[in-house]
Amino acid sequence: MGNSAARSDFEWVYSDQPHTQRRKEMLAKYPAIKALMRPDPHIKWTVSGMVLVQVLACWLVRGLSWRWLLFWAYAFGGCINHSLTLAIHDISHNTAFGTSCVSRNRWFAIFANLPIGLPYATSFKKYHVDHHRYLGGDGLDVDIPTNFEGWFFCTPARKLLWLVLQPFFYSLRPLCVNPKVVTRMEILNALVQLAFDVTIFALWGIKPIVYLLGSSLLGLGLHPISGHFVAEHYMFLKGHETYSYYGPLNWITFNVGYHMEHHDFPSIPGYYLPLVRKIAPEYYDHLPQHHSWVKVLWDFVFEDSMGPYSRVKRKCKLAKDHL
């Protein structure tokens, strides 16, 4: 497990991201796609049920041994919490209540955040806007690994460790790459999360807190669902920077696998993204795609051509509202 990844730098390009032009072409050809730009009527009920399931799980694990607690945190809680982060991703595009109810979407994302254990939703939204606007943008898109990550995590063993540590890199990277002022909503997110955690601790002790945090750290680390982190934008085929996954795990991840469709139309909820492909199959069926997130993780670790450097990067001009 000692072979180093072949890449020593990112894949630098000097063209704009492809999704803006694709969006214009597709809307001109298929105006019916605009009808999909509406709230998802199911997500608020699905998310509410998931939050309640995790609260019930907190009660159930209060008497478990530590070994079994960690097992269930990975096998069950990890799936729920990772899925909740993907619900938060969807809600960050105002898909729960529509663009006319921005505040309600933000507060609902904070509610979905509760089982995660740490405040996350508001900060995610702040940076995710840049990910779409400046896809691959140097110093702007914090989804891109740092140069240190690309340089150090270059062997199979180190890439495996990098996957395990994904929650930490996704949390800390924005502070290093593109630090921003803490907003009032982020403070409120933290206070609500603290109140929830203190309440759970007061009711049932430390084990439920460890369960929730373990569910997040284990579920977002080396876990089958975490294949989407790599599948979405890591360059498995030169010249392609966004990939869709068409496999069964879309059922429990709010269709995050339909990632080419999502970047083409960020305002369409995950629930409706399969319809985009159905309406305009010629824009998607011929593109490289994934069918197994586990295989994605395996290939990322053991293919010498893959590593944190396997990302398309570009210089982007700041939009006027960023100046």
Swiss-Prot record:
Swiss-Prot/TrEMBL GO biological process terms: ceramide biosynthetic process; sphinganine metabolic process; sphingolipid biosynthetic process
UniProt-listed Enzyme Commission number(s): 1.14.18.5, 1.14.19.17
Transmembrane segments: 41-61, 68-88, 210-231
Entry GO CC: endoplasmic reticulum membrane; membrane
Lipidated residues (N-myristoyl glycine): G2
Lipid metabolism recorded as keyword: yes
Sequence motif Histidine box-2, residues: 128-132
UniProt motif Histidine box-1: location: 89-93
Entry function: Bifunctional enzyme which acts both as a sphingolipid delta(4)-desaturase and a sphingolipid C4-monooxygenase.
Name of the featured protein: Sphingolipid delta(4)-desaturase/C4-monooxygenase DES2
Biological source species: Mus musculus
